[in-house]
Amino acid sequence: MNTLNRCALAALALVGTSAAFAQSSVTLYGRVNTTVEHQKDGDVSKTGLFNNNSRFGFKGQEDLGGGLKAGFQLESGFDSSSGASDSRGIFARQSEVNLSGGFGAVRLGRFTAESYYATADYVSMHNHDTGSSSDAFYAYVMPDANKIAYRTPTFGGLTVDAAVALHEQAVGGKNAYDLAANYNLGALALGAGYSKQGDVNQFAARALYTFGAFTVGGYVQRDEDAFVANGGKRNTFRLAGAYNMGASEFHVNVGRAGEYKNTPDSDATQYTVGYNYNLSKRTKVYGYYTRINNSRAGTYGFNQVPVGAGVDSNTLAVGIRHNF
């Protein structure tokens, strides 16, 4: 029995146990997000159907009394263009168990680094972290697996997350560390994040401001050796803006990756313009154009998949996203 069939059977089993749902407050959720795109890398072009981080998951919480709660979240990625399951594993997007209360929350398992959510995720507003228009330059240092994490209660709008990812005796492996902070002041939201594993590290800071129908934001990041081994340090920034008008959203986004100190001409720029039309709170149709211009030694590509040195890429896409 293949992985996808096992995953489907597990989903059916969970859906069928209505008593367990009632006792554990389990929720089935997900997203199907697919685009038709014309992509071009240098002189090579292709037109096709592309998955954009489609996923489904289960999450639940049990009230243990005295303000203490136990919870879990299991999330699986799949390819919406073909139906194939995530090659990394059934619940490779997220698999965690947690305890929360007045003390904050303790989390164990696999989940996305909070340093990413505190900074880059907020600034990729047009389609968040999905697809070829996603951030090509953000240095994601923290491993997702084998994590122990703690989240503080919120104090005056400030929340802090800290995590360690254990290497579990892997040959040459080192523990990784992640620290993030979010400070919400109504229309103004601030964030910062730091990650480190061995000599590879990154620090980023973000600001997002909403006024009327407009939202503007940006982040700056400094990393060391994240994309290029022994490349040295690199500075990156990204700016984004959005305007909402009824069901329509208009987005513009530009990012700039500086060259690594030990790798001359490794800099690049990414431009994105996008339009979303919200058919409902859960469903939207959208289109975007994004382009990555690499300098002579730059290798940045869509979905952070490297291309040949100096190769420029662009794509024109239309898509449908439905959340459930």
PLM feature spans:
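Extracellular loop and loop/strand-boundary signature of outer-membrane beta-barrel proteins
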Residues: 42-45, 225-228, 258-262, 302-308
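Detector for outer-membrane/organellar transmembrane beta-barrel domains
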Residues: 176-278, 290-291
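Transmembrane beta-strands of outer-membrane beta-barrel proteins
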Residues: 29-35, 73-75, 109-111, 161-165, ...
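Outer-membrane beta-barrel "beta-signal"
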Residues: 148, 179, 311-324
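Sec/Tat signal peptide C-region and signal peptidase I cleavage site
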Residues: 18-22
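Outer membrane beta-barrel
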Residues: 23-38, 44-169, 173-175, 182-186
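Outer-envelope beta-barrel architecture signal
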Residues: 24-30, 62, 66-70, 102-106, ...
